[in-house]
Design a protein with these regions (language model features):
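Sec-dependent N-terminal signal peptides
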Residues: 3-12
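Sec-dependent signal peptide cleavage junction
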Residues: 15-84, 276-277
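Exposed, low-structure sequence patches enriched in small/polar residues
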Residues: 18, 114, 139-141, 258-303, ...
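Outer-membrane beta-barrel proteins
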Residues: 42, 51-57, 61-68, 73, ...
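Low-complexity, highly charged intrinsically disordered N-terminal segments
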Residues: 75-131, 138
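Short strand-turn segments of transmembrane beta-barrel domains in outer membranes
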Residues: 118-119, 126, 130-162, 183
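Transmembrane beta-barrel wall of Gram-negative outer-membrane proteins
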Residues: 156-178, 187-220
Length: 663
């Protein structure tokens, strides 16, 4: 609540400051200039008769990798694809019935971002913002962005962010994402809150730079276990059950939650620097740097009374809680030379403590410990260099001591053939242990207790990717991946498992043979006048000895849309229809106790179309969205599952807006 109050106060201030109108430039809808005369940011630096014209390039957004982009208030089809709860293109995902409930994967990637295992519960934490997802800002005047979208039944989604500079060298931002959706089916309510605040600073002489953020996040979901009579109450299309609260579900008193807090700091100091050359870049620089991160995170499953759906239980009331605390420190030195390139080398220390609140003793006397903890020490290295038209990048994370981490190596080379065509090749290799919930888990449910910390081997992933970016021919990506010791969840029993009882026998397993995965993705838009057809197609093929990795062979999304200025260019309009389809396959099942997906090979799901109709508009810096989602649900058959027993949502109309304003 204190975060919400703080954000509301900041937004109120920003709205008051933002009442000065920002003139719309007489250009096409690319919002390249704000066209506003304003005073310098720092009143102390004010000069007589001084005024400046602000452009969109005065509003910078800086990524974790320190890549800088500018505020974009255009209305494009890509913005339509990203206008959702995750605020990312969900082409390779299949959402569940309620917004934010879970997302089954239609496409998979094996690249590891970090060297260390995660807490787990991956089906529930897609909205949990990792440090690589936090953005930093540098803005000429205070900038506010409001993202709003309706949800299902009660609730809404609001993402508010305020960024402001107190001087040309110091920036602060504060953001809060508040979300609630009751859902159409019983006991599927989802609530989440993501509070973030950031700062970044550069000293007057440019030698010292700092950036930091704090994130406090929680995601809470009711769990209904899926439909109890799906043939009679869903697949039949019986009008008595079109009102979804009448549909019977398996659970009515269960929920799970993820809660985490993170503190992050990264700063550098230039020991040696030379004067700028004619291109305004330093010829040589030598810097030392330090980064720090402390995070606490837990996953909890609660149930007021146990259910046979998950097998036998020790206690009637279920309260399973896995906690992870991590502490990361890195010291590095960075050398830059215009001829030699940029080289970073350093050493890091990672301390972890993953634990439960009790020790579990099995009937045969086997003790399952309640804790995994230790310290890992490793080396880091990064290299960047541009040679002619080639851009080379490489990074290495190498573990010196410890049991968890392995090695991560990424390398890429890109080349611009001309202004319209670019190619890029990437290589990835990594080794590390699976996530903590595969290694150690404890639950009040007897079958959900295991210790694989001394049994499981490190997963080894490698991939080679080639990409073509062409304004003429479209964008093509081809990637081939190998994975050894692939780890997954699946039902395991010496006896035949009855239908609907998979969740009572879920165990973590590790595949001893190599799994190979081919992924080909192509995107191309055809345009004729004001009409356009945007196409994205993905093909996948898996080579494996056992059926442990299931993905659809083909996924396609095609959007036919119309774009034009209307009302004497006072509004820019986009409207169209999106078609999405994926071939039937053994879609992964969902497990509420773990908040994870598991492999099942009993039934194929998929092979159904999804049709959406949208009308979007842009007025100055405001984008308005209106969509009829899955409007074909009532006449294309009731077989649209997102996972076994979990249907996708029915036809629904939703609307919202994204509004940027300045002061």
């Amino acid at each position: 609540m204190k975060y919400i109050i703080l954000v509301l106060l900041c937004l109120t201030t920003s709205i008051v400051l933002g009442q000065d109108p920002i003139e719309r430039p007489e250009k096409k809808n690319d919002s390249l200039s704000l066209g506003k005369k304003t005073k310098p940011i720092n009143p102390k630096e004010k000069m007589e008769n001084d005024s400046i014209t602000l452009t969109i390039e005065d509003y910078k957004i800086i990524s974790f990798e320190r890549d800088t982009t500018y505020l974009d208030t255009t209305l494009t089809l890509q913005k339509e694809y990203k206008y959702n709860y995750l605020r990312e293109d969900d082409f390779e995902l299949m959402p569940f019935g309620n917004i934010g409930q879970a997302y089954n994967e239609l496409g998979v990637d094996f690249e590891r971002v970090g060297s260390y295992p995660n807490l787990g519960a991956l089906a529930k934490d897609r909205k949990y913002l990792e440090r690589e997802q936090i953005k930093y800002y540098n803005v000429a005047t205070p900038m506010t962005e409001l993202f709003f979208k309706t949800t299902l039944e009660e609730g809404q989604l609001l993402d508010a962010n305020l960024a402001f500079n107190t001087s040309r060298r110091l920036n602060f931002s504060i953001g809060y994402i508040g979300f609630r959706s009751l859902g159409k089916y019983n006991d599927t309510q989802i609530e989440s809150g993501n509070f973030t605040t950031t700062t970044n600073y550069i000293s007057k002489n440019g030698r010292y730079t700092l950036r930091a953020h704090i994130a406090a996040q929680n995601i809470e979901s009711e769990e209904n276990g899926g439909l109890s009579d799906r043939e009679e109450q869903f697949e039949s299309g019986d009008e008595d059950f079109i009102n979804r609260p009448r549909v019977d579900v398996l659970l009515d008193d269960a929920n799970n939650k993820i809660l985490g807090k993170r503190y992050y700091l990264d700063h550098q100091y230039k020991l040696v620097r030379t004067q700028l050359d004619s291109t305004r870049f330093e010829k040589t620089a030598l810097s030392i740097g330090h980064s720090f991160e402390y995070e606490t995170k837990y996953y909890q499953f609660l149930e007021t009374s146990n259910d046979t759906l998950f097998g036998d239980a020790i206690l009637s009331e279920i309260d399973d809680k896995a906690i992870l605390k991590t502490f990361y420190n890195e010291a590095n030195i960075q050398f830059y030379n215009k001829t030699l390139g940029k080289l970073v080398g350093g050493v890091n220390m990672y301390n972890y403590d993953y634990y439960f609140n009790s020790v579990f003793i099995e009937e045969d006397g086997t003790v399952i410990p309640n804790r995994l903890n230790g310290t890992e020490i490793g080396l880091v290295g990064d290299y960047e260099k541009r040679i002619g038209g080639f851009d080379f990048k490489a990074d290495l994370r190498y573990n010196l001591s410890g049991e968890l981490a392995g090695n991560v190596f990424n390398a890429s080379a890109s080349y611009s053939l001309n202004k319209n065509n670019k190619i890029k090749f990437s290589l990835h290799t990594s080794t590390r242990l699976p996530n903590f919930n595969y290694l150690l888990y404890q639950s009040e449910y007897l079958n959900y207790n295991w210790d694989n910390s001394e049994v499981f081997e490190k997963e080894r992933a490698s991939s080679l990717k080639g990409e073509l970016f062409s304004k003429t021919w479209g964008n093509l990506m081809v990637k081939y991946s190998n994975l050894d010791n692939y780890t997954y969840f699946a039902p395991v029993s010496d006896e035949e498992i009855a239908d609907g009882m998979d969740n009572a026998f879920i165990k973590p397993l590790q595949e001893g043979n190599t799994v190979s995965h081919l992924k080909v993705k192509y995107q191309k838009e055809f345009k004729v006048g004001m009409f356009a057809l945007n196409n994205t197609v993905m093909y996948q093929n898996v080579t494996q000895d056992s059926q442990v990795l299931n993905v659809p062979q083909l996924v396609t999304r095609n959007t036919l849309y119309f774009s034009s200025d209307v009302f004497k260019k006072a509004m820019y309009l986009q409207t169209g229809v999106t078609f999405k389809y994926f071939t039937a396959y053994n879609m992964n099942g969902y497990n509420p106790v773990l908040g994870e997906f598991y492999v099942q090979n009993k039934e194929e799901l998929g092979g159904y179309p999804l049709l959406d109709f949208f009308i979007n508009a842009r007025i100055q810096q405001t984008r308005i969205y209106l969509k009829a989602e899955h409007f074909n649900s009532s006449f294309s058959g009731y077989d649209y599952y997102a996972a076994p027993n979990y249907p996708y949502r029915d036809f629904v109309i939703r609307f919202g807006l994204v509004w940027n304003f300045f002061s």
